[in-house]
Amino acid sequence: MKKTSNRLHSLFAALAALILAAALAVPAFAVEGGFADLYYRMNDSAGVLTEDEDNELEDALEELSLRQSFDVTIATVESLESVDYDSMEAYADDLYDFCQFGYGSEMDGVLLLVSVGDRKWHISTCGYGITAFTDAGIQYLGEQMTPFMADGDYAGAFRTFVQWSDTYIDAARAGHPYDVNNLPREPLSLMLSLIHI
């Protein structure tokens, strides 16, 4: 009887260890094979969007991220002081890491952070995002978004970010990331080149 009790105890211990190991491994596999999906991709803490705009952008970010296997996220804060940070870059990087944004083992993705009260923005990249979003490309993207933000049209700025992010990822995957010598053509310069033909 004692042998059966010991075997049963050993079996339960082994089963408990197996269940614990499986439970701990599931989150690691989930991140390794895709997205952690712990937080919304549209985080409007500053409250600059209407509910409809927030939902529209969340859907657009979700669709883009899944289609590209690349996490595209946006966050707003009232000010750096409100989150107890001095640096946009430090807060954006910490937020990206804390929320476990990114796709796969390299955590491929991009985060646009906007501090409304400070009138500042920062783009944080990780994994393949570093290739897809070069410094020159980020500067160009900022030039496309800031007129909307200056007018208080944050939804317009964020729609622009989503659309250009899709283009940036495609360009990088085609082997031509937007950079100093390969920035998108301005519509006016394209028209002028057609006129000269």
Feature-to-residue mapping (PLM):
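Bacterial N-terminal signal peptides that target proteins for export
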Residues: K3-L15
